[in-house]
Every structure is written in structure tokens, then in C-alpha cells.
Regions:
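Long, highly hydrophobic alpha-helical transmembrane signal-anchor segments
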Residues: 1-23, 137, 147
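Helical transmembrane-bundle signal
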Residues: 19-29, 98, 123-133
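Interfacial loop-to-transmembrane junctions
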Residues: 100-125
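Cytosolic, membrane-interface loops and tails of multi-pass inner-membrane proteins
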Residues: 31-59
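Transmembrane alpha-helical segments that form the membrane-embedded catalytic/substrate-channel core
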Residues: 23-38, 95-104
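Juxtamembrane boundary at the C-terminal end of a transmembrane helix
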Residues: 131-147
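Short alpha-helical packing/oligomerization segments
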Residues: 76-96
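Core segments of transmembrane alpha-helices
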Residues: 63-76
């Protein structure tokens, strides 16, 4: 069977599914902010509440995810062209960590957001992969990585 986008490796489907997973998580975190706005009476366009710290934690979990999303997606999509399984694994680790990060933050104790700190491993893996792909694309590196 021919892949829908022929110039991409067939395994790039894993990367595409990881992008869908990231979209799902980001939307879910946004829905949680919307629910918290109603519960804690924080009207638009206010980003934060002066009285409700728990709302601020819920909002911050979503905002931080949005801040990192563009860099994450660029790394995921670029590395995925050369190493789709590696990129998807790193991506799933990172995206899953965003749930743990958010749920820790939702307790109202910002230190508990560190429950999702393992996501740094996935993000760092993508950053190193992007550097490697860039160097290899320039023909400056004959080093082989087994992924």
C-alpha cells in the first residue's frame, strides 16, 4: 500500500498520531480552563484571578503548554521525517508528561507541577535529534545513530 504522502516514510504516521495526541491534550487543558473560569468566576479577557490561586494554576498549566507547543511541534515534525519512531516515542513521552504537569498544578500547589518533569527527556531527545538531523543533512556527520 502506498502512503498518502509518498515522500514521507510510512512510519511517519506515528508522528502524525503524536501531533493528534498533542492537539487532544492541549484542547483538553483549554476546556479545563473554560470550566475553571465558570467555577471561579473569572471573566474574559482576564488571564488570571486576583483572588483564586487555583484558577491561576489551572490557567498556567494550559498557558505553559501553549508556550512550548510550537517548538515541540517543529522538532517533532522535522526529526520525524528522518526518524519517525524515535520522534514519536519522544513526542509521546513529552505530551503524556503535560497531563502529569497539569494535574500536579491543578492541586493548587505549583511545586506539584514537577510531577511532569520527565517530559524534559522527551523534549531534549527531540532537540538532540533535530541537531543531529541538521548536521547530517549538511553532510558533516557520518556518525550512525541506531534509531
Amino acid at each position: 500500500m502506498v502512503a498518502p504522502i509518498e515522500f514521507l516514510p510510512n512510519e511517519y504516521g506515528y508522528v502524525i498520531l503524536c501531533v493528534f495526541y498533542a492537539m487532544f491534550v492541549t484542547i483538553h487543558l483549554g476546556i479545563n480552563v473554560g470550566k475553571a473560569r465558570k467555577k471561579y468566576n473569572v471573566p474574559y479577557p482576564n488571564m488570571y484571578s486576583e483572588k483564586e490561586n487555583i484558577f491561576n494554576c489551572i490557567q498556567r498549566a494550559h498557558q505553559n503548554t501553549l508556550e512550548q507547543l510550537p517548538t515541540f511541534l517543529v522538532c517533532l515534525l522535522m526529526v520525524g521525517v528522518a526518524y519517525p519512531k524515535y520522534a514519536a516515542i519522544c513526542g509521546v513521552v513529552y505530551v503524556t508528561s503535560r497531563y502529569n504537569y497539569a494535574w500536579g498544578y491543578y492541586t493548587g500547589d505549583p511545586k506539584k507541577r514537577l510531577n511532569g518533569e520527565y517530559g524534559v527527556a522527551g523534549f531534549l531527545g527531540l532537540m538532540v535529534g533535530l541537531l543531529y538531523v541538521g548536521i547530517k543533512q549538511l553532510g558533516c556527520c557520518d556518525m550512525y545513530l541506531p534509531f
